[in-house]
Amino acid sequence: MIWKLSERKDWNSLEQQFGWVRDMNQVPQHTVHHAEGSVAVHTRMVFEALLRQPAYLMLPEQEREILWAAALLHDVEKRSTSVDEGNGQVTSKNHAKRGETTVRTLLYRDIPAPFNIREHIASLVRHHGLPIWLMEREDPLKRACEASLRLDTSLLKQLTVADICGRISTDKEVLLEATEFFEMFCREQQCWGKAREFANGTARFHYFHTPRSYIDYVPHDDFKCGVTLLVGLPGM
């Protein structure tokens, strides 16, 4: 059975069904980076951009539903994080992080989704900006591999491309180029469309919890120990 956030996907129906969709109409955005207007206008444009992607149309139905839901929800918490700094500058720091929590709650309480689907959508919302800024941050390899353990990086790129194309701004070409670098990097690091593999659980734990660690390092397994067992019989 295919899970769907909603059978009715036209915008008017979505507004009637969900208060958080209606809220998007009241949330302004940065007039330079999002000259199209409110979050509602942007999200509708993201839908249109997503439907223009051949890769999206070729996905299995369940993956299309996951990506569609992530597109609808990717900016849901701009409503709680947006701050008007004046002169058309609107910031929304941590909207993706807060959105992840909202999505997880929503898909648990209001629109129940299977665990793996819920977590995939929540992770896509959390990381929807990752392909844009990955190469500018400290330790991009660790960030990419960590994301690959939570989501499909090829779906993440599709979401980010739709997010970029679904806006009016002057830097779209630069942002789209960043998503291409993201794909190249993930392919090179063996985490494109799949989770990055490690030799074992200990190696994975060591890599993510040790600063400046080598990704293919396999720690010596020193968890074994000797046991001396004393057994006594009653009355002996």
Task: Give the positions of each predicted feature.
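Exposed alpha-helical structural elements
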Residues: 10-16, 20-23, 45, 116, ...
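Conserved hydrophobic/aromatic pocket- or pore-lining residues that grip, position, or stack substrates
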Residues: 46, 99, 233
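Divalent metal-dependent catalytic cores for phosphoryl transfer on phosphate-bearing substrates
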Residues: 51-175
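Interdomain "pre-motor" coupling segment immediately N-terminal to P-loop NTPase/helicase cores
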Residues: 157-199
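Glycine-rich phosphate-binding loop of ATP-dependent small-molecule kinases
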Residues: 187-236
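Short, well-structured alpha-helical interface segments that form or flank functional binding sites
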Residues: 41, 120, 225-228
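Acidic/His-rich, divalent-metal-binding segments that scaffold phosphate/diphosphate chemistry
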Residues: 1-85
